[in-house]
Amino acid sequence: MHDPLGNPVLRNARRIVVKVGSSLVTNEGRGLDAIAIGQWCEQLAALIKDGREVIMVSSGAIAEGMKRLGWSLRPKAIHELQAAAAVGQMGLVQMYETKLRENGIGSAQVLLTHADLADRERYLNARSTLLTLLQLGVVPVINENDTVVNDEIKFGDNDTLGALVANLVEADALIILTDQKGLYTADPRKDPAAQFVHEAKAGDAALEAMAGGAGSSIGRGGMITKILAAKRAAGSGASTVIAWGREPEALIRLTQGEAIGTLLVAQTQKTQARKQWMADHLQLRGSVTVDPGAASMVQVGGKSLLPIGMTGVQGDFSRGDVIAVKDADGVEIARGLANYSSAEARLICRKVSSEFEKLLGYTGESEMVHRTNLILSR
């Protein structure tokens, strides 16, 4: 029997991304499994009522579309896959909406592509929307927008999308529910000596050799995609669990600390990982100058930069670009992701958030740079 207090990683996780595979959602392609989806939704509701925030990344649109269209074999033509995704997405989202509503929880459909997360402005827009939904106690149900993006159907997988969403919202953990118990040292269907891996470091090169290429004929991803997804999620400090989706009360038991499935532990803390990524990969586009009070709040207080504390804007930058924050002497004190373009920043400089709608024509974030997107300069 597992020690229920033996795994603090999931027990302490407050923001969780759950990814469930198509073979589970559609009962191996035989149509949406209403009982299983209902059980997951019941668990999601319990987690939210426990004060956690949860995002569901669900495969199954293409598989459900195939069932509705009477196709037994997954087609190879892109336009047929897109058609199946369009047909299946209707039923998939309706099922989640119904089952979550039965448990008193609201839901929202969010369709993303990798391109949405590669563009800085769209990245921030998606992040803001998802964080707002979480604050409202709503479960975002996310899928790839297979209907319009060719190479996502051809090359993408929802394991990767789950990891990207974990990066996007700075999740504490990614739970990948699959039709396998977890990771073994070899394929247990071929090697009777294969040993189960209870815990390992995310990104360990040896894991990829263990994973092999086994996967479902209904979905796109095998165990190797899950290992790579865990590595990607660890880049923003999120640990990953790969577990059997039919395990009774799996989500509840995991968040109570029970050791179910394979735990792949991130080696970097969430905040450190995100800020290191910003420092390494994003180019400086401009700067803002701030008054002594704002400088102190950013440097000493660890607070967000508010427009009312800005005294000047330099350069030409867009929302999502990296800008420098300079004190009254022109010395850089921090860098961060701008919530407003340089043109907008000039309009709201020295203004309070209640004035933004009149000045900009809309109400956006109250911060010029949120504290989670700020890196103090040395």
UniProtKB/Swiss-Prot annotation:
Q: What is its main location?
A: cytoplasm
EC number(s) for this protein?
Answer: 2.7.2.11
Domain PUA per the UniProt entry, residue ranges? 285-363
Annotated binding of ATP, by residue: K19, T178, D179
Q: Which cysteines are joined by disulfide bonds?
A: none
State the Gene3D superfamilies in the record. Acetylglutamate kinase-like (3.40.1160.10), PUA domain (2.30.130.10)
Q: Which UniProt keywords apply?
A: Amino-acid biosynthesis, ATP-binding, Cytoplasm, Kinase, Nucleotide-binding, Proline biosynthesis, Transferase
Sorted alphabetically, the Gene Ontology BP terms of this entry are: L-proline biosynthetic process
Its pathway, per UniProt, is: Amino-acid biosynthesis; L-proline biosynthesis; L-glutamate 5-semialdehyde from L-glutamate: step 1/2
Molecular-function GO term, any one: RNA binding
Q: Which GO terms describe its cellular component?
A: cytosol
Q: Which domain of life is it from?
A: Bacteria
Q: Which SMART domains match?
A: PUA (SM00359)
Q: Where in the cell is it found?
A: Cytoplasm
Q: Which reaction does it catalyse?
A: L-glutamate + ATP = L-glutamyl 5-phosphate + ADP
Chain positions recorded as substrate binding sites: S59, D146, N158
Question: CDD domains this protein is in?
Answer: AAK_G5K_ProB, PUA_G5K
Name the chain's protein.
Answer: Glutamate 5-kinase
- Organism taxonomic ancestry: Bacteria, Pseudomonadati, Pseudomonadota, Betaproteobacteria, Burkholderiales
